[in-house]
Amino acid sequence: MAFYRTNLPTRELFSLVSVVIVLLATNINSVQALSFNFTKLTTANSGVTFQGDAQILPSGLIALTKSSPFPPGQYFTTVGRALSSNLVPLWDSATGKAASFVTSFSFVIDTTEGPITDGLIFFIAPPGTVIPQNSTTPFLGVVDSETSINRFVGLEFDLYRNSWDPEGRHIGIDINSIISTKTVTYNLVSGSLTKVIIIYDSPSSTLSAAIIYENGKISTISQVIDLKTVLPNTVQIGLSAATLTGESYSIHSWSFVSDLETTASYVSNI
């Protein structure tokens, strides 16, 4: 699977990704695969594990952080994560092959409650991952600031410039650290819907993302990452957000599909 820069209109681009997801999902006879498509969720059977302050709203959307207005001039740390309850087979130890995957999600950040801080991240981490200690505010609920041992890969949407960050708000690819290996500018518009498509192409070991703004503009970012050297062969995927000042983070949709050729399917193809 390859990823290319595109001039397609937003609707057509998202439709194309939907077709890719369907095609991958229908190829499960020869591979170990996982797929899901979350739109409006219910507490009865969401397929999502919530941690910290994350919850399902009455509208069926996912709120990652507390959204209640804080008293004037008073701010409180809030961090929350939503993870797929199912584990993702990432690579096969017998064949050495890694999975390719496509995930897409859409979200709204509302910054009307106060100054803007912190941000949101899509992350891949070892199974059983929980919110680390010392991981609030700039560490987005994925990094323990008191240790150098953090194991994850992520795509962050950073709203606040810390000492290690580039100038301005940015989108970054993170590998075991909140210091991004590659960044592009993040053009946040409070209250607008942002759509994200992330593709990992196993043959080229390339993680690529397209960020589609409500006005139709698209940003892209990519990085070569051999996930086998970073993560265990089974992982969990999730979305996390943290803030100190009261902006809200809501997830409006989330889909995922992966494929992994295992030992059995590899032998059957010889």
Swiss-Prot record:
Reported tissue expression: Expressed in nodules of Rhizobium-infected and uninfected roots and in the root stele near the nodule attachment point. In roots which have been colonized by the endomycorrhizal fungus G.versiforme, detected only in cortical cells colonized by the fungus, mainly those containing arbuscules.
Key words, A-Z: Glycoprotein, Lectin, Membrane, Signal
PTM comment text: Glycosylated in a boron-dependent manner. Glycosylation is required for localization to symbiosomes. 3 different glycosylation variants, NLEC-1A, NLEC-1B and NLEC-1C, have been identified.
One cellular component term from this protein's GO annotations in UniProt: peribacteroid membrane
UniProt keyword Membrane, yes or no: yes
Cysteine pairings via disulfide bonds: none
Signal peptide extent: 1-33
Official protein name in the record: Nodule lectin
